[in-house]
Amino acid sequence: MKIKDIKEGLIDSGTLIGMPALFLILPGTGEEGTKKGVDELLEAVKNSFKRYVVIAGGTIADQAEELKVLLSGIEDLYCHTVIECDGREMLDLDADLYSLSLKPRGTWPVENINAYVSAGRIVELKIYLEDEIDLRETLIALSNHNVPRSAIFFLPAGDDLESYRENAVFLSEECLKYGFRLGERLRFTLGK
């Protein structure tokens, strides 16, 4: 498998926010990665003593066959797996949680989201919102799928603490109005 990075950290947002995890970051399209065997990655998981393993990056679908073997091995180590992706590619992988990060002005993979839910996958949607236009587009898109509201997080968009806080105030009011969960992003809360 090609791996861009292996690191330990806290899960930044969503249902498992704040949980310690081992992150296996896959290279994006056109990026280089270091070739690692499944056994080597399982050893890294075992040595990390983390109960959660997050697999993220741009080439999840490209490495699906190796990931199936890796996910099975991680399960044998009694760890939970999270796949973080944008949901545009349908992945047939046995992860404990599919954490889909969405941006309203992009194309929403409604069919894939519904297919994940229909297949019994546990799915959470983390939707990064910046303004009223984002909110309107999101509310329309959400009417077309069957993810429970308890698994939908509205996350404040922002590249710095000031814009993050401004969006958090706006979103808190909208979450109250529409009944969605306001998500937090630890990197801003912790000032990292």
Please give the residue ranges for each predicted region:
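Conserved Radical SAM active-site core
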Residues: 1, 5-11, 20-97
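Short secondary-structure boundary/capping segments within folded domains
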Residues: 12-16, 173
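A generic structural micro-feature
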Residues: 16-18, 119
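Conserved AdoMet/S-adenosylmethionine-binding subsite of the radical SAM
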Residues: 42, 61-192
